[in-house]
């Protein structure tokens, strides 16, 4: 009985592997628009697709980032300045993309731009601390998608949205996890709606990788800022030891993160170039073998694990 079951599982995986290896034809004629290309996943993906001969339209936040990217790629790659929090910037970038793709449409949209913002207890936050992250990671992503999706539909192309394993498990307070849960929900509804037009939507859920999002200096500085802005009553409840423990954890975060960003960009590339892309990609061994399985556990077990492994407030019961 068990041997038959194992054989069926093995056969299924072989068939899936064979099916997923089939590549889309005429990649050199396909346009891909990527946000957040100054550094990290977006920067590496832009260079990766450029090497494959695709027509990369890379959106950067700064001119410096755009210049550095152009210096490392072929003349095929083009850059545009885009701030996903500003409607006028999105409108201008969309028009720029439309002028380049013409009647062929846009084969791929990769929503990669994102920030970590302030991470910490929700009680320490104000509305702006959370809204500033949602503006980039969620609302900006949605507006870019709504603006460019007619071009993607014309090409019967792909939308690739970068979520996170933090869209499956809420590790901490603040806007980051909220935004990534939102990316998951928006992508699920978008995938079903666009399936009628031959458009495929994929979600990439990276684990912990060494990028600007996991920069320990930035995260600990933002955490200290939260501590300084909260009331004396709240500081008394949490205590200095809690602050020190959390700062130590954040300062060492990037050292514990995976440096091989290609584990993520390979998933993005597959979603754009495979005839049969996956709906979801878990990128990184921590995501595949720890955080994703953990997300399927009963809630009380997940809560208990976080309770026993997280810093404790001074006035905790």
From Swiss-Prot:
Keywords: Endoplasmic reticulum, Lipid metabolism, Membrane, Microsome, NAD, Oxidoreductase, Steroid metabolism, Transmembrane, Transmembrane helix. Disulfide bonds: none annotated. It is an enzyme of class 1 (oxidoreductase). NAD(+) binds at residues 33-57. The chain crosses the membrane at residues 289-308. Oxidoreductase with a preference for NAD. Oxidizes all-trans-retinol, 9-cis-retinol, 11-cis-retinol and 13-cis-retinol to the corresponding aldehydes. Has higher activity towards CRBP-bound retinol than with free retinol. Oxidizes 3-alpha-hydroxysteroids. Oxidizes androstanediol and androsterone to dihydrotestosterone and androstanedione. Can also catalyze the reverse reaction. The C-terminal region plays a crucial role in controlling the activity of RDH16 and its required for endoplasmic reticulum (ER) retention. This is Retinol dehydrogenase 16. The lineage of its organism: Eukaryota, Metazoa, Chordata, Craniata, Vertebrata.
